[in-house]
C-alpha cells in the first residue's frame, strides 16, 4: 500500500488505493489547502457538509485522524464502558485485532455475544457483501466499515438504510479518492447514540484533522 524502509515497491499488490489514480478534484483541494493555520477546532463546516451528504444531523458525524485512529478510539470506548469481547470477520483489516489486543478485548466467535462487532461491506479482500450479522444490530457496538463502498461496481449494500441507522458507519475516503497518503476519516453514529457520539468526540485529540484532511 506504500513505501517501506526499502522505498517504493516496483510492483505493489497490497495497495488498497483506487486503481484509477487520484481524483483530480480532491487532489487539487489537497494541494490548495491552507497549511499556515489551524483548522476550525469544531470543524463546523466540514461536519455540516458530511451531515448533508449522508442526510443526517451534524451531531452524528464523528471525525477521526484516520480509520485506524477511529478503530483504536472506539475499541477503547467499548473497553472503558465494560465491554470485553470483540467479533472479527474471517478476513479483515489487521487494526481491528490490533486495537482489540491493545485494549484487552478478547476475540469472540459468537457474533451475538460480542460487545464490539466489526463488519466491512463490501468486504476486503473478497469484494463481496459481509455475512454473519448479529440477530439484533443494536445489541452491541457494531461498526460497519464502508471504506470500499464507493468502489462497489455492482450489487446493493448488505444492510438497508434503516438498518445502517442502527449501527456505526466508518468511512475513509482516501482509498476511493486515490489519496491514501492523506490521513482522514469519519464515522456516522447510530441514530440512537447521541451520548456515545459525544463521548467519542471527547476522546479525540485537539485538531484531530489537519488541513489536508479537511
Where does each model-flagged region fall?
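Glycine/small-residue-rich loop that forms an oxyanion/phosphate-binding "nest" at active or ligand-binding sites
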Residues: 67-77, 81, 127-128, 144-161
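N-terminal "arm"/small-domain region of PLP-dependent enzymes with the aminotransferase-like
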Residues: 1-41, 49
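Short, conserved loop/helix-junction motifs that constitute active-site signature segments
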Residues: 80-81, 133-139, 160-164
Amino acid at each position: 500500500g506504500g513505501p517501506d524502509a526499502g522505498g517504493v515497491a516496483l510492483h505493489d499488490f497490497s495497495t488498497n488505493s483506487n486503481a484509477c489514480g487520484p481524483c483530480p478534484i480532491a487532489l487539487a483541494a489537497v494541494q490548495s489547502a491552507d497549511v499556515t493555520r489551524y483548522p476550525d477546532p469544531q470543524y463546523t463546516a466540514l461536519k455540516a457538509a458530511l451531515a448533508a451528504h449522508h442526510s443526517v444531523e451534524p451531531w452524528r458525524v464523528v471525525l477521526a485522524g484516520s480509520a485506524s485512529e477511529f478503530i483504536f478510539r472506539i475499541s477503547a470506548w467499548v473497553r472503558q464502558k465494560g465491554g470485553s469481547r470483540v467479533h472479527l470477520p474471517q478476513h479483515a483489516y489487521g487494526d481491528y485485532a490490533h486495537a482489540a489486543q491493545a485494549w484487552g478485548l478478547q476475540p469472540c466467535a459468537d457474533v451475538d455475544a460480542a460487545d464490539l462487532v466489526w463488519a466491512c461491506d463490501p468486504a476486503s479482500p473478497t469484494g463481496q457483501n459481509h455475512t454473519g450479522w448479529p440477530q439484533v444490530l443494536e445489541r452491541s457496538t457494531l461498526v460497519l466499515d464502508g471504506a470500499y463502498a464507493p468502489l462497489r461496481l455492482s450489487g446493493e449494500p448488505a444492510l438497508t438504510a434503516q438498518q445502517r441507522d442502527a449501527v456505526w458507519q466508518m468511512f475513509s475516503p482516501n482509498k476511493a479518492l486515490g489519496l491514501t497518503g492523506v490521513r482522514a476519516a469519519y464515522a456516522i453514529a447510530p441514530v440512537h447514540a447521541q451520548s456515545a457520539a459525544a463521548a467519542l468526540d471527547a476522546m479525540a485529540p485537539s485538531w484531530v484533522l489537519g488541513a489536508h484532511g479537511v
